[in-house]
Curated annotation (Swiss-Prot):
Catalytic residue list: 131
Binding site for Zn(2+): 130, 134, 202
Keywords, comma-separated and alphabetical: Cell inner membrane, Cell membrane, Hydrolase, Membrane, Metal-binding, Metalloprotease, Protease, Transmembrane, Transmembrane helix, Zinc
Its EC number(s): 3.4.24.-
Species, as recorded: Brucella melitensis biotype 2 (strain ATCC 23457)
A GO cellular component entry from the record: plasma membrane
Gene Ontology biological process: proteolysis
Protein name in the entry: Protease HtpX homolog
Transmembrane segments: 20-40, 145-165, 173-193
């Protein structure tokens, strides 16, 4: 079923790309857009994961460079019956994480230094279990290809003003209307597809992630902390590349402009409530978890300690001492 949904979403994005090509260049523009879309789909299948990781300057780690983090992911992957994914760290203050890759055999998970430093080990386990659930559900191929195509569609819409109107239909009113439609429809169309990709998949990944890590409240507590952090700590790379926002466990965009108009993620409170209900049904007490999850905000556990001069954003002087340094 996931493969069918993937094919439908890729087809929808291709039709959107071709439609914009027609608005900008008539039949010729549509055919050029089709060729570009096919090439991008093929390229995205093989390389979109590498592009996203490179975009965020993700650093691959192993058991020697980040022992606790790597072993945690290894144990969770074993719990899920998955091959060991590649493990990455993103030097970014905002707590967040994502998974990518075309299949479980070629998957990667990435967490920010903000996530590893500010969350307890239990909460980190909940987050990484959620990302492995995306891998197991084969959501990662869809998310990475959609991120690539959505970015291209949005860019094409931005270029519409400079490319001019539909020359095949004349440079008059229709050309102007076509250009304006491309400029307006393209970014919103990309956002709508992102919403369709992310919202239902996040609930499924939350449920499966809770099963993988063994405690739904680890993940629910983590979601609350990440959501609060994302509101006050900007992720500049994500702000510059909003087409990748749906890949993260929590929307990394700060809400500037129209970011909150069409959210790429379901409401965090609803996700937390669903996880708490799952915990109650399995007999896990939230009070005991609260005491563990609300451990010191400056975590000095297996991820290392935050230095005294920390506090800037990822472009500033916030530095961490940990196994990835």
């Amino acid at each position: 079923m996931n493969m069918t949904k993937t094919a439908m979403l890729i087809a929808l994005m291709t039709v959107m790309f071709m439609s914009i090509g027609y608005l900008l260049g008539g039949g010729g523009g549509m055919m050029i857009a089709l060729v570009i879309a096919v090439a991008m789909n093929l390229f995205g299948y093989w390389n979109s994961d590498k592009m996203v990781l490179r975009m965020y300057n993700a650093q691959e780690v192993d058991e020697r460079s980040a022992p606790e983090y790597y072993r945690m992911v290894s144990g969770l992957a074993a719990n899920a019956g998955l091959p060991m994914p590649k493990v990455y760290i993103i030097h970014e203050d905002q707590p967040n994480a994502f998974a990518t890759g075309r299949n479980p055999e070629n998957a990667a998970v990435a967490a920010t230094t903000g996530l590893l430093n500010w969350l307890s080990p239990e909460e980190v386990a909940g987050v990484m279990a959620h990302e492995l659930a995306h891998v197991q559900n084969r959501d990662t191929l869809t998310m990475t290809i959609v991120a690539t195509l959505a970015g291209a569609i949005s860019m094409l819409g931005n270029f519409a003003f400079f490319l001019g109107g539909n020359r095949e239909n004349g440079n008059g009113v229709m050309g102007v209307v076509g250009t304006l439609l491309a400029m307006i429809v393209a970014p919103f169309g990309a956002m709508i597809v992102q919403m369709a990709v992310s919202r239902t998949r996040e609930y499924a990944a939350d449920k499966r992630g809770a099963e993988i890590c063994g405690n739904p409240l680890w993940l629910s507590s983590a979601l609350g902390k990440i959501a609060r952090g994302a509101k006050v700590i900007p992720n500049e790379e994500a702000e510059h590349n909003p087409a990748t926002a749906h890949m993260f466990i929590i929307n990394p965009l700060s809400g500037r402009g129209a970011d909150n108009l069409f959210s790429t993620h379901p409401d965090t409170d609803n996700r937390i409530a669903a996880l708490e209900q799952m915990a109650a049904e399995t007999g896990i007490r939230s009070a005991a978890m609260t005491a563990r999850a609300a451990a010191p905000s400056q975590n000095s556990g297996p991820w290392g300690q935050r230095s005294d001069n920390a506090g800037g954003n990822s472009n500033g002087g916030s530095r961490y001492r940990g196994p990835w340094s």
